[in-house]
Amino acid sequence: MEKLFTGTYGVFLESNDSDFEDFINTIMTVLTGKKESKQLSWLTIFIIFVVCIVVFTFLYLKLMC
């Protein structure tokens, strides 16, 4: 990882710091394989909500009998 930073730093010596930071963030994202996905988080919230409704409905019906 240090070799990557050292090699790419020489290319960006004369450019803006923000360009270098954006490039490093892009490289880190590619290397770690992390993807930002807001759709997945909404899907997770929806599934948890549905599971809660099912559990509460089951408990309500169980108490009624």
Curated annotation (Swiss-Prot):
Query: What Pfam families does this protein map onto?
Result: Pox_EPC_I2-L1 (PF12575)
User: Which InterPro entries does the protein's record reference?
Assistant: Poxvirus_I2
Which domain of life, per UniProt? Viruses
Q: How does it sit in the membrane?
A: Single-pass membrane protein
Q: Where in the cell is it found?
A: Virion membrane
The UniProt entry's GO CC annotations, sorted and at most eight, read: membrane; virion membrane
Q: Name one GO biological process term.
A: symbiont entry into host cell
| Membrane-spanning intervals of the chain | 40-60
Q: What induces it?
A: Expressed in the late phase of the viral replicative cycle.
Q: Which UniProt keywords apply?
A: Late protein, Membrane, Transmembrane, Transmembrane helix, Viral penetration into host cytoplasm, Virion, Virus entry into host cell
For this chain, the family text in UniProt reads:
Belongs to the chordopoxvirinae I2 family.
Q: What does this chain do?
A: Late protein which probably plays a role in virus entry into the host cell.
Query: Mind telling me what this protein is named?
Result: Protein I2 homolog
